[in-house]
């Protein structure tokens, strides 16, 4: 009975495979939105004010960072929790594949969230005159919470690695 339960639990990791595939579909949706924004801005680039163009560019950078986060979670999560990716020897392989454990992934995700939050906060500050002060305050508080959380997670990771 114990062996059966262990085998079922071990096999259940494959339930995550469609979830990671779903993230690849989300990446496609993000890419479509990215290029929709490009196609929207290009015909009007000369009519846009510099600040408006910078806001659009920050949105594109934001989407790019989210896309990178999706790829990192998709591949690392699949390799850590489902199965090793079998990439042919002749094909290009990302140098971090197979080297990122769950803790490293968590720290990289936290750093990515801080970067994404920074870009979003910069976009908000670019339009600060149209944002109420209390909303601006909450954006800063939320961003600082992300920064503090990432710092604490990194510090705790460093402590646990140092003690082992």
Swiss-Prot record:
S-S pairs: none
Keywords assigned: Cell membrane, Membrane, Transmembrane, Transmembrane helix
Cellular component, GO annotation: plasma membrane
Pfam families: UPF0114
UniProt superkingdom: Bacteria
Matches recorded under InterPro entries: UPF0114, UPF0114_bac
The keyword NAD appears for this protein: no
Primary site of residence: membrane
Mode of membrane association: Multi-pass membrane protein
Cellular compartment(s): Cell membrane
Residue ranges crossing the lipid bilayer per the database entry: 10-32, 53-75, 136-155
HAMAP family tied to this protein: UPF0114
NCBIfam families named among the record's database cross-references: HI0507
Family: Belongs to the UPF0114 family.
Protein name: UPF0114 protein YqhA
Organism, as annotated: Salmonella typhi
Lineage: Bacteria, Pseudomonadati, Pseudomonadota, Gammaproteobacteria, Enterobacterales
């Amino acid at each position: 009975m114990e062996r059966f339960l262990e085998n079922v639990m071990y096999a259940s990791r494959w339930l995550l495979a469609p979830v990671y595939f779903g993230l690849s579909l989300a990446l496609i949706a993000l890419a479509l939105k990215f290029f929709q924004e490009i196609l929207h801005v290009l015909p009007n680039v000369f009519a846009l004010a510099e600040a408006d163009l910078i806001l659009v560019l920050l949105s594109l950078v934001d989407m790019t960072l989210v896309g990178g986060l999706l790829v990192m979670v998709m591949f690392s999560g699949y390799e850590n929790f489902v199965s090793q990716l079998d990439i042919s020897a002749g094909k290009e392989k990302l140098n971090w594949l197979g080297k990122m454990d769950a803790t490293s992934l968590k720290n990289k995700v936290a750093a990515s969230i801080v970067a994404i939050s920074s870009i979003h906060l910069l976009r908000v500050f670019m339009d600060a005159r149209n944002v109420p002060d209390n909303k601006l305050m909450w954006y800063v508080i939320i961003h600082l919470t992300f920064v503090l959380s990432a710092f604490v997670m990194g510090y705790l990771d460093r402590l646990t690695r140092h003690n082992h």
